[in-house]
Amino acid sequence: MSLAVRVIPCLDVDAGRVVKGVNFENLRDAGDPVELARRYNAAGADEITFLDVTASTSDRATTYDVVTRTAEEVFIPLTVGGGVRTVEDVDRLLRTGADKVSVNTAAVARPELITEITRRFGSQVLVLSLDARRTEDPGCASGYEVTTHGGRRGTGIDAVAWCREASERGVGEILLNSIDADGTREGFDLEMIRDVRAVTRVPLIASGGAGEPEHFPPAVAAGADAVLAASLFHFGPDDMLARVKDALRQAGHTVR
């Protein structure tokens, strides 16, 4: 595990605006992505993740102009994902200003994409973004299923097994998002974090369910190297980032 726990605001972007819903549905406007990125950068965020949440479902490319403007305002690592399908997409995003690129749907459809990207750019630029949900499907031994297209399509693929395979293919980080917990603000899915941590040494970013600063330390204790949230930061008090870091610090974790 890394020495310092990273705290990462997530900007889910639809048509140039930050949105947030519950369980990936009923999206509501949360503001301008460039302004929010600027605010979080000033407030002490360690990184920012930018996800074009409709790119994979509507078959359109990531909004490059928004990425460019965001990168100009942010002086911390910026991860960008949504609609990334090819090595060329990764190259363009890195040239646009992204420090890291996340893949989701396209990697599930063609796992070789992970290998191709890491061979060209290195593992450090690639984040596997995984939207997982609980399932009773006997084909998913862990009890978690990989979903694609913004959580709208089930795959029948075991989420923990997929994390193991992606790690073996060279992915640099795994962004582990619980669809069941997403937007509920009731806490992270600790069992899922523990199960994935048991099969990989790749850094894990816990996502989905944060509702108060006290939810973050248990995620780190379960095995997360970084913690990510959206609605808590978008709709919470201006000092929420500081509160989260204080909670982590008080629980004995190192933060920047």
Swiss-Prot record:
InterPro entries: Aldolase_TIM, His_biosynth, HisF, IGPS_HisA/HisF, RibuloseP-bd_barrel. GO terms for molecular function: imidazoleglycerol-phosphate synthase activity; lyase activity. Pathway: Amino-acid biosynthesis; L-histidine biosynthesis; L-histidine from 5-phospho-alpha-D-ribose 1-diphosphate: step 5/9. It is found in: Cytoplasm. It holds the Pfam family His_biosynth. Its EC number is 4.3.2.10. It comes from the Bacteria. It is an enzyme of class 4 (lyase). GO terms for biological process: L-histidine biosynthetic process. Belongs to the HisA/HisF family. IGPS catalyzes the conversion of PRFAR and glutamine to IGP, AICAR and glutamate. The HisF subunit catalyzes the cyclization activity that produces IGP and AICAR from PRFAR using the ammonia provided by the HisH subunit. NCBIfam families: hisF. HAMAP family: HisF (MF_01013). This is Imidazole glycerol phosphate synthase subunit HisF.
